[in-house]
Swiss-Prot record:
Name this protein carries in UniProt: DNA-directed RNA polymerase 7 kDa subunit
A GO CC term assigned to this protein in UniProt: virion component
Compartments it resides in: Virion
GN (gene name): RPO7
Subunit: The DNA-dependent RNA polymerase used for intermediate and late genes expression consists of eight subunits 147 kDa, 133 kDa, 35 kDa, 30 kDa, 22 kDa, 19 kDa, 18 kDa and 7 kDa totalling more than 500 kDa in mass. The same holoenzyme, with the addition of the transcription-specificity factor RAP94, is used for early gene expression.
Annotated function: Part of the DNA-dependent RNA polymerase which catalyzes the transcription of viral DNA into RNA using the four ribonucleoside triphosphates as substrates. Responsible for the transcription of early, intermediate and late genes. DNA-dependent RNA polymerase associates with the early transcription factor (ETF) thereby allowing the early genes transcription. Late transcription, and probably also intermediate transcription, require newly synthesized RNA polymerase.
Catalytic activity: RNA(n) + a ribonucleoside 5'-triphosphate = RNA(n+1) + diphosphate
Length: 63
């Protein structure tokens, strides 16, 4: 699942580009070829969340 990403400057939905970056693992350069607005390009380049590590660590008993 990819969370929705909206460009705060122009209002364009750039979730599909985020999907290609995170799920399809395309390079940022390849994805940005299809994005024309500079504001959207900047948002994609700087605000993509890295994959989260969802493994649970056991609690350490300090007593």
């Amino acid at each position: 699942m990819v969370f929705q990403l909206i460009c705060s400057t122009c209002g364009r939905d750039i979730s599909e580009e985020r999907y290609y970056l995170l799920i399809k693992e395309l390079s940022l350069k390849k994805v940005l070829e299809g994005v024309k607005n500079n504001c959207c390009r900047l948002k994609l380049s700087t605000q993509i969340e890295p994959q989260r590590n969802l493994t649970v660590q056991p609690l350490i008993d300090i007593n």
